[in-house]
Structures are given as C-alpha cells and as structure tokens.
Design a protein with these regions (language model features):
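GST-like domain detector, emphasizing the conserved glutathione-binding G-site
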Residues: 2-151, 197, 281-283, 287-335
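Amphipathic alpha-helical segments that form well-ordered structural scaffolds
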Residues: 38, 42-45, 179-186, 190, ...
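Acidic carboxylate-rich catalytic motifs and surrounding loops in phosphoryl-/glycosyl-chemistry enzymes
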Residues: 52-58, 202, 255-259
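A structural motif
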Residues: 146-164
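A mid-sequence, solvent-exposed acidic-amphipathic segment
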Residues: 161-196, 200
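Short His-centered aromatic/hydrophobic patch
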Residues: 190, 212-254, 316-328
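GST superfamily/GST-like fold recognition
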Residues: 200-218
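Juxtamembrane amphipathic/hinge helix adjacent to a transmembrane helix
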Residues: 227-228, 237-291
C-alpha cells in the first residue's frame, strides 16, 4: 500500500499538467455535472495545473470524473472518488494543515453535505424539474429514444434510492427539503464571515459544498424550491459568487484551465492540449491499447443493450398514450 502511494505521488509530481475527464460545460459552468464540479473545484483550490477533457460516451457511467497523471488514473467509482483518492494517497490533501480538534466538525459537516444536500439536489434534478436540465448535462448527444429511456431509468433509480413511493411522496418531499434547509442554516452559521468553512484555507468540504451551491444557483430553474431556500442565506450566496470569480473566471474567459477538449471516449487517454504533449511510455501504451479494446467492446454492448431497451420499451408502452407517459416522468402523485 505504501509503495503504491509512493508511486502515485511520484507520478503526480512528475506530470507537469494533469488531465481531468469530466462531463461537458453548460449553464455557465466548466462542467455542468454535479459530481464532476467538486473535483474540478478541489483541483483549482489546490492550485493544481490541469486540462479538462470532455467525455460524452457513457452518460450513465459512474467512473466519471477521473484524473489522469503519468501512468495513474483516479476514478470516481474507486476509493471514494477523485478527491478521496488524492487525499488517501497523500497527493493533494487540503485538510492536512487543519487543527486536529477541527476534524470532528469537518467530518460531520461533510456528512451533511454528502447526504442531506446531495439527496435534495438529486431529488430536484431527477424527480422535480423537467427533463431539460438533465438532458443538457447527460443526454443531449444521444438519440431521443435512448435519452428518454435513460432519463426514465435514472428517475426510477433516484426515487428508489430516496425511498419515494406514490403513498409517501409528499411526506418524503417535506423531509428532503426540511433537511436541506437545516443544512443551509448550519452551514451559514459555520461559514459566518470567514473566507472558508473552516477558517482562511479551503478544505475538501468547501469543494463539495461549493460545487453544490454553484449547481443549484446556475443550473436549477428559478422555480426551484432548493434554490429559493439557498438564496435566503446571503453569506452562502456571496461565498459562491466570490469563489466562482476566483476559481472559474479562467473558464469564462478562455474556455477552461488550459484546455477543455472534447473526447468521444470514456477510455483514459492522453492527448495534446495547450502545447502540452502527452506521450505514454511504450509499456503504458500497450496496456492502454488492451484497455481500449475492452472499452470499445463495452461501447458496442452499451449501444446494443440500449437499442434493445428502446425496442422493449416501445413494445410495452405501445398501447399507452403520450400524456400518460409524461405523467410518469413528471411524478405528480394524486391522493
């Protein structure tokens, strides 16, 4: 374990510019994906030079975002995600200088952001709002039938994850929003007039919370209940606006940190960006070629399964009128 950590740290130091693979920009954000945005902000807070590559191949893939550096790749679905990987491997840890007596508060605050606020955001994105927001982030590059099926599947999965049924929908909605508002209240008191949540230096909790706030303020519609709750806390909104200028101004002026190049593959890749040439070692190139074959096979399998899903869906729903299908998406329950 120590040897692996040492190797990863050495690869990180040796690579002049890292590559963050994320979903595409939208809503004035360098990546509109609520999972990718905190990873990007964490790297910016740590002043890490990196380029952004956009992945559009697998809208339901859970390994995105990921960071490439040297021969190493930190995937979102491994070791707790990109941020946790960088901390665990002692590569980039913004909490290392935090006083030890602050750790209990940091962990409880992080849990609140990762549960109450994350649940509320998922609820609004997939259950409450219309399909346009998720469409822009995940499905706009897919054909209409596949995009619609994937959105329906994700909505169903989120409702199951949050324990929402037709019988308890109103009760669960009240609970989700009550917890989110309580979280905003606690975070507002925690932030106060400080620069960051835990003093004058950022932590991973700041990156997670800032990603949440920027998404809510920029991506969710004006009718969003979550957005209206957040806007009641001026210091939280001001914090987000200030950090957006400091950390994301480069994206609005030049299109990204060095580069924001599109990628049609979810395969870890090396490319050229801003004059930087990424040339993997011969051995690494051979390993990546084998991985690429697997990813291409996965692509074919993905497309085939989605085609079958569309055909099955059309057969099942062939006798159902469109308004009824829309009701299923809108999730408007009647007593």
């Amino acid at each position: 374990m120590a040897s692996a950590a040492t190797t990863a740290a050495a690869e990180w130091e040796a690579e002049a510019r890292k590559v963050l693979v994320a979903r595409k920009p939208a809503f004035g954000l360098p990546t509109a994906c609520p999972t990718c945005l905190p990873a990007l902000l964490y790297l910016r807070m740590a002043k890490v030079p990196f380029d952004i590559h956009v992945d559009t191949s697998f809208p339901d893939a859970d390994h995105i975002p990921y960071v490439e550096f040297g021969e190493c790749v930190a995937f979102n679905n491994e070791k707790g995600g990109v941020i946790e990987y960088l901390k665990e491997e002692k590569i980039v840890d913004l909490t290392s200088n935090l006083p030890s007596d602050s750790y209990p508060d940091l962990l409880s605050t992080k849990a609140m952001v990762s549960t109450w606020l994350a649940d509320a955001l998922q609820y609004e994105l997939w259950v409450v709002t219309d399909r346009s927001v998720a469409q822009d982030i995940y499905f706009s590059d897919l054909s209409w039938p596949i995009g619609k099926i994937l959105h329906w599947k994700k909505t169903r999965d989120v409702k199951q994850l949050l324990g929402i049924t037709k019988l308890n929908a109103a009760e669960r909605e009240d609970e989700i929003y009550r917890k989110a508002n309580a979280a905003y209240d606690a975070l507002s008191m925690r932030l106060g007039d400080q620069a960051f949540l835990f003093g004058n230096s950022p932590t991973d909790v700041d990156a997670l919370f800032l990603g949440h706030v920027l998404f809510v303020l920029n991506a969710l519609p004006g009718t969003s209940t979550l957005r209206s709750y957040l806007q009641n806390y001026d210091n939280l909104v001001n914090f987000a606006e200030r950090m957006k200028v400091q950390l994301l101004a480069v994206d609005s002026s030049s299109g990204g940190s060095g580069s924001s190049a599109p990628s049609s593959s979810s395969m870890p890749r090396k490319g050229t960006s801003s004059g930087q040439s990424y040339k993997p070692k011969p051995r690494a190139k051979k390993e990546r070629t084998e991985e690429e074959k697997k990813f291409r096979q996965r692509t074919k399998y993905f497309l085939a399964t989605q085609l079958v899903a569309v055909l099955v869906f059309l057969l099942i729903m062939g006798g159902v009128d469109s308004p009824e299908l829309d009701d299923e998406y809108d999730v408007e329950y009647e007593d």
